[in-house]
């Protein structure tokens, strides 16, 4: 809804083929409504003293954001593109990940100390890596990976955008629904990823068919 600059990121060539690969489902029912669905995207601004706690990880297993590799191909429930809109260096509150945690069958022993809504910060968890990014860099990762952020200690604002991709049979996590105005101006490929269940008539005035 924020305009063309953000619409161009829906299927940006730098990562869209990676999303199709990791979400998978080619030649199966998972592609019945198209290759992908974006259930959520947002811009996050973070000032000094702020962070987001660690979350996700392979345990407990969650279908929506699961990592799966089977039969020689990926089938991941949700894959994120995190786009740095500013330089993110030491002290800037960078994204923190625990490598390999998307395959874990056990909860990280320190997770509760640094989880969301706790007083801890991601850089304090054993085995975590804080990722530094230049403006324009994109971090692609399955949402099942344990991730969060470090505490921002520098002045200024960290700015990122996040786009979450999954199979076309998914649904919105929150109550947001795309406006008719947005759907009218999107390309057919982008419209399919934003609203895969709705087939619009040639004028995009009303739904022609809704899939159950």
Spans of features found by a protein language model:
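Non-heme Fe(II)/2-oxoglutarate
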Residues: 111-112, 138, 145-212
């Amino acid at each position: 809804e924020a305009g063309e600059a953000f619409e161009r990121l829906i299927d940006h060539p730098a990562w869209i083929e990676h999303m199709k690969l990791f979400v998978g489902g080619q030649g199966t029912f998972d592609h019945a409504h198209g290759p992908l669905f974006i259930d959520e995207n947002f811009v996050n601004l973070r000032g000094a003293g702020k962070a987001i706690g660690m979350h996700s990880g392979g345990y407990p297993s969650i279908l929506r954001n699961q990592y799966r590799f089977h039969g020689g191909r990926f089938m991941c429930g949700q894959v994120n593109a995190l786009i740095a809109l500013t330089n993110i260096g030491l002290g800037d509150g960078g994204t923190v990940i625990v490598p390999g945690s998307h395959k874990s069958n056990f909860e990280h022993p320190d997770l509760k100390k640094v989880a969301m809504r706790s007083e801890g910060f991601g850089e304090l968890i054993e085995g975590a890596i804080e990722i530094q990014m230049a403006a324009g860099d994109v971090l692609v990762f399955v949402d099942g990976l344990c991730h969060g952020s470090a505490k921002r200690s520098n002045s200024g604002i960290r700015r990122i955008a996040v786009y979450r991709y999954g199979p076309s049979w998914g649904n919105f996590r929150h109550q947001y629904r795309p406006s008719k105005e947005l759907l009218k101006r999107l390309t057919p490929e982008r419209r399919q990823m934003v609203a895969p269940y709705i087939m619009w008539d040639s004028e995009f005035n009303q739904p022609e068919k809704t899939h159950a």
